[in-house]
Swiss-Prot record:
It catalyses: acetyl phosphate + [thioredoxin]-disulfide + NH4(+) + H2O = [thioredoxin]-dithiol + glycine + phosphate + H(+). This is Glycine reductase complex component B subunits alpha and beta. It comes from Peptoclostridium acidaminophilum. Keywords: Oxidoreductase, Pyruvate, Schiff base. The peptide chain is cleaved into beta and alpha chains, and the alpha chain N-terminal cysteine is deaminated and oxidized to form a reactive pyruvoyl group. It comes from the Bacteria. Its EC number is 1.21.4.2.
Length: 428
């Protein structure tokens, strides 16, 4: 499968009379966009704002982040099974408004939406302080149930991303990247001396607002299966969850999965990148056993020499992570796991809720319990009053002067387990 990604570099976002991209500037017809989003069921009100890198702006509570994309050649469309019809994605050509993002906010859905600061120390912990953000402030009808509230914000964000993405349909990209995956037999014949490596992509599916969607299907209801890596770039996997914002994968991150990107970069040089296995993180033990069994079985079936396993979330999914690692290793496949830690504010507690001696190659993306003080911002987009109750906050987090003392758990993307962030380590 071959996919061309045409990146159109966006240097600024402005409101204008027509939604278009011109000389690197994304112009948005605010009234037209609000009108299109206001027809979504159960929406009470919609407004738009813009937040740029370096501005004294805080966005909270952040529900999701979406990168504007449009399918210009080939089968399928963006966000298949949800926005476009159900058809296999991941081939043809897709244009991306690189540097732009749609950020959804509104009244808090559960208690785990996050914070994005566009400047100050908090900006160093979120990748979305570097994007030009079109913020959609969406308020649902009064008295709506929580799961419907989440769905409303999710659909507003996805529709907003598709609307903005259309502005790039006829624009000549600034760069075109090509991603191509051979069949298993073609790859083995082409690279007989390279180790066969697969990527096990764990999806948050605990339920109760902790959901992920694959081609529109609630991933709680799937068994592990194989995807072409390029399918995720067209939005085959969507975030629908309100898990702690530091380590949940927003839809933007699913479309820009750095694990997939790095494995493609190594393909044909250091490794033979065979493909992606997606699996879930259900709460029942029988589901965990079934999914980890199937994941290990698929790794063996593909003849992998090595596998990288990434987690989403923490706590209960730590068990899924360790079960996957243990069983894949038992099939003779060398395994590396990528996670984050909840090791207490002093970093001295057990990092994961589960462990096994076979989990001996671990990448940590940071300790979510680390405490930070965010300075006051001149402007807040959204609702600041939820700071004390979101995950990572506590009674008194929001101070009288507008500063915030929180664990970095509250910052969107701070310890992203795919490595989509700015925390790093150096070896000496």
């Amino acid at each position: 499968m071959r996919l061309e990604i045409g990146n159109i570099f966006i240097k600024d976002i402005q409101f204008g009379e027509q939604t278009k991209v011109e000389n690197g500037v994304l112009y948005v017809n605010k009234d037209e966009m609000i009108k299109k989003l206001s027809v979504i069921e159960h929406i009470k009100s919609v407004d738009l704002d813009i937040a740029r890198p370096g501005e004294s702006v805080r966005i909270t509570p952040v529900k999701d982040v979406i990168e504007p994309r449009v399918k210009v050649e080939g089968p399928g469309g963006i966000f298949p099974g949800v926005i476009s019809k159900v058809e296999t994605d991941g081939s043809g050509r897709t244009h991306v408004l690189k540097g732009a993002a749609v950020v959804t906010t509104g009244k808090v859905v559960g208690f785990q939406e996050g914070i994005v600061d566009m400047s100050g120390v908090g900006a160093e912990y979120t990748p979305f302080s570097k994007t030009l953000n079109l913020v959609v402030i969406a308020e649902p009808e009064d008295g709506i149930e929580q799961h419907r509230h989440e769905e409303v914000l999710r659909m507003v964000g996805l529709n907003a991303g598709v609307y903005i993405g259309e502005a790039g349909r006829s624009v000549t990209p600034d760069e075109v990247k090509v991603y191509e995956t051979d069949t298993i037999f073609e790859g083995a014949a082409k690279y007989p001396n390279l180790p066969k490596v697969g990527y096990v992509y764990m999806l948050q599916t605990q339920g109760l607002l902790h959901d992920t969607y694959v081609y529109g299907v609630d991933a709680k209801k799937i068994v592990p299966t194989i995807l072409y890596p390029t399918e995720v770039m067209d939005g085959a996997i969507l975030s629908g969850n309100c898990v702690s914002s530091c380590d949940k994968n927003p839809t933007y991150v699913h479309c820009n999965n750095p694990m997939v990107e790095e494995l493609y970069a190594m393909h044909g040089k250091e490794i033979n990148f065979v493909g992606v296995i997606i699996t879930n993180e259900n709460v029942y033990l029988a589901d965990k056993e079934r999914s980890s069994d199937w994941t290990a079985k698929l790794c063996k079936f593909l003849g992998l020499d090595g596998a990288i396993v990434s987690q989403e979330g923490f706590g209960n999914p730590d068990t899924d992570l360790i079960m996957n690692c243990k069983k894949i290793e038992m099939e003779g496949v060398k395994t590396v796991i990528s996670t984050d830690e909840y090791a207490g504010r002093d970093g001295a507690s057990q990092s994961l809720a589960d462990a096994d001696v076979r989990a001996n190659a671990v990448v940590s993306n940071g300790n979510a319990n680390m405490v930070i003080v965010l300075p006051p911002m001149d402007k807040t987009i959204g609702h600041i009053q939820y700071i004390d109750t979101i995950a990572g906050g506590f009674d008194g987090s929001l101070r009288a002067d507008g500063s915030i003392e929180v664990e970095i758990q509250a910052i969107t993307g701070a310890t992203n387990e795919l490595g989509f962030g700015y925390l790093s380590a150096k070896g000496y």
